[in-house]
Amino acid sequence: MDYNLYDFLPLYHPVQTPAFDRDVNSLSEFTQYELPREEEFPQNPGDLMLHQKLISNFINPHTLYDGVLLVHEMGTGKTCTSVAVAEEFIKNNYSSGETYPYTMVKKIIVLTKGKGLQNNFVNEIANVCTWGQYLEGLDRYIRNRDKKIKKNVKVHYTFDTFEIFAKNLAKMSTNEKRMTYENSLFIVDEAHNLRLHSDPEEGNIYSEIYDLFHLLKSRKILLLTGTPMKDRPEEIIDLFNLILRTPLSVEDLDQPEQFKRKINGHVSYLRAMISDVDRREMGKKLGSLNHFRVQPVVMGDFQSQIYQLAKAKDDEEKSIFNNSRQSSAMVFPDGTYGKQGFEANILPTTSGHKLKPEIRDELRLNLRKYSAKYADLIDRLKVDYTEGRLSFVFSEFVKGSGLVALGLLLELNGYVKATPSSNFAKPQKRYAIFTNETSTDAQTKQLISAFNNPKNLKGEYISTILGSRVIMEGFSFKNIQSEYILSPHWNYSETSQIIARGLRLGSHNDLKKNNIKFEVRIYHYVSLANKNYPAESIDLHMYEIAEEKDLEIQKILRYIKEAAFDCRLNQQRNTITNRKFDGTRNCEYSSCSYECSNQVDIGHDNRNYRLLYFQSADQYEKLKATIIETASRQPFTIEQIVAETKHSEFEVMTVIESLLNYRKVLFTRPEGYYYLSNIKNLFFASNVVFDRDKHYDSNDPTLLNYYTKYTTVYMGKSIGQLIQENQQKYMVFLVKKIFKSKNLVELQKYMVQLPIYLQEKLLSYSISVRHQDIKNNFVRDMVLNNFKLYYKIQDPQAFIWLNPENFLCTANYRDPDQWKPCTPSQQRDIEYMKRDRANIKVSNNSYGFIGLLNRKTNDFCLKKLQGPTLSDEPTDKRKRNVGKRCQNWKKVDLVDLVANKLKVVPDEDFDFTAEDANTVKNNPKFKKLVTPEMDQNDLKRLAFWNAQDVNHLCRTTLTQFTAQKLVVDDPNCGTANKIR
């Protein structure tokens, strides 16, 4: 095994160098995460996707890369990507075995636009992006859970809004900033909101944060965004300049190659996994549009006149065209529109809204007069329903002339509004509406679940979805075949996000499985005041401006995609293979195929991976398992493992050295623990600790034959002697642990591992010194408490029946040397004692249960007592109630026992208000447990114990029953040997 010094030194090259390009496309810690075209989403909390692992290896304690802009589309898991990076630093800060150079961060600071986003971020950290470490200890609480989670998360993460963070920075001196924020990791969520602004206050926020990032010499920065530019290409300059040590200028945008060189190593680009189903933009190109297709509808004279007045009002008020936009959607028969029209023509009801009766028939019969857009839409929705196509309609307007009014128009045309209580077993023409004002999150999720159900393929449950901006994040629709965009936006990025709700990866799998041929048709509605003057349209005007902006933005986005450090690694995922999209927005208005700036071929260089990452990789654990399994069977050499596993010699030695140096237990057998040992290049399992520095004559053929033949090496002693010696060593170890126990649970953990004769020894000595003031009286009392079911003292006599095959008795329990096997008559007396004790437990028991404990298995059972006061005697006398494991009882019975009968007090920090008490009273699941005479304390107990898991309820019951001497010995508890 010949190694050079550089084999043990990790190496990363600086960005913007040819060596960096080689590193990114060849180092195994990066290239092993090359993305396939499709990838399954994680099923368990803390599981990461490939691109998330890649970024966490790029911005990492061991790398010198200090700032990356993540241009990752919506749905790629940007939050979890940043958390994966942060958790690597947290893990490294607490690692005691780190041997290579690394960056330790003092703080992890998450910056968001508003406080609401912070709550989402905390929730993602605790429940989605990590394996549960921030939820530990919370399973027993139902109140203040979010507050407790946030407290746990804030141990490692600090949260601030852009505004508050900038204001605090403005109050700090330069030295204070350095002292506070040097060696910090900054995560900036929705970073496109942080930019130079015409508003002085917004501009100051950007400047303060920019100055801090450039003041710090050692910092790591992650900027998260799915839309780095919304209105102008120049917005990207502000973003990159937050992380670049050498700033960009606007002129760089006109020099693509120079721009790409300057951002090299500082940007990652990733498309979402989107559906590759056929989609068709309906309509035609109008006005100055060269790429966007729109679906034009011409207003009738009445609507057109009102629209012209609304437009003039907007021009006069120099407003944001709200009047024009509302009136182009719909005007009411009285000539009103928007907020005024809504209040004058739509009435509130207990379940929502309704149209005034006097306008219902007019709108049903002459809708095109008042809304060309809605009349055309409803005609198309009727065809969709008839032909079994699911449809999705979007408008950013809810009230006014928006979605609520549209829903009422649908009802005039035979639709029924779907609610969570709808009878979906009966097919019906239904629509569902999702807005902040018409449905809660829970209701929205229920209805989307019904809509996405494979049984709703042709609209049997719900045929049409009406959605506002509330559905932009977190919701996806399946099997949509028609999408209708009723209101445009000044930039197209938001419109594209809306369309993507119905075009996700796998969103149309149910249609494919049923061999239904389909395409997704997309309609961008524009209302024209007059077909001869298409420019007279606020809708068309907005699309023209959006396209003009989008052409420039997408050109810069193509540069970013080509310059991304992970361009080659993500190319399969990012490339759209359907040639029909060439020249469209989907491919940045260019060819869908593209070349990366970094042209280095993908390779696999393990120089850093084996040093920094191998020990935390799945391959390491698999190799370790193989080595342990081999050692359990026979001795082995390194060469044998290399040949068998195809791992490198370095990797095999890494595992072996870890097992040797840290004396890790390979496996346990009755004679003790086994460790890995070696003599030169021969490795074997042994429960004898070998001194690695001691010389052994490994050339002795007899010794070598012995090593090869036997897994474990012993010298000069019989197997029986060695087993006895090792058992003695282990027993000493257990007894030491018992005498260091801090509580009864800890003592029981080690006590059950002792042979029964040693348990008897400890119990008999504890009985003999029960009245003495000894050093370990705390342990003595725990031993007596642990075995209280298995002894009785009748001063001066005492009896122990811990071992069912050998009872112990003494005529003078104060003398520890007088314990002897019981005589037959004493054994009979003990059986009477046990029976009498059980009878007392039944007769004095007001709880309806008795506890059974199996000492051999530590199983705890509950037996329901029978009798006239507790339950009727069974008519079939052959059936006997023998009890069952506590965990097998219904939770409601255990809650009733602990809360209502034992009346165990809840934890001190369990908050409970009068409002909570009313909730408990009215909750159907507490119906059998709540009685009229219960006060707030009773209800608090009930709520608390209902929030606990069954294991905790059983532990509490055992503790309470043991304290009240309501537990009896039963060797059949928890076994299949019950007498029935």
From Swiss-Prot:
Keywords: ATP-binding, Helicase, Hydrolase, Nucleotide-binding, Repeat. Pfam families: SNF2-rel_dom. Residues 59-246 form the Helicase ATP-binding domain. Residues 389-546 form the Helicase C-terminal domain. One of its GO terms (molecular function) is helicase activity. Disulfide bonds: none annotated. Its EC number is 3.6.4.-. The keyword 4Fe-4S does not apply. ATP binds at H72, E73, M74, G75, T76, G77, K78, T79. InterPro entries: DNA/RNA_helicase_DEAH_CS, Helicase_ATP-bd, P-loop_NTPase, SNF2_N, SNF2_RAD54_helicase_repair. It is an enzyme of class 3 (hydrolase). A motif (DEAH box) lies at residues 189-192. PANTHER family: DNA EXCISION REPAIR PROTEIN ERCC-6-RELATED (PTHR45629:SF7), SNF2/RAD54 FAMILY MEMBER (PTHR45629). Belongs to the IIV-6 022L family. SNF2/RAD54 helicase subfamily. This is Putative helicase 087L.
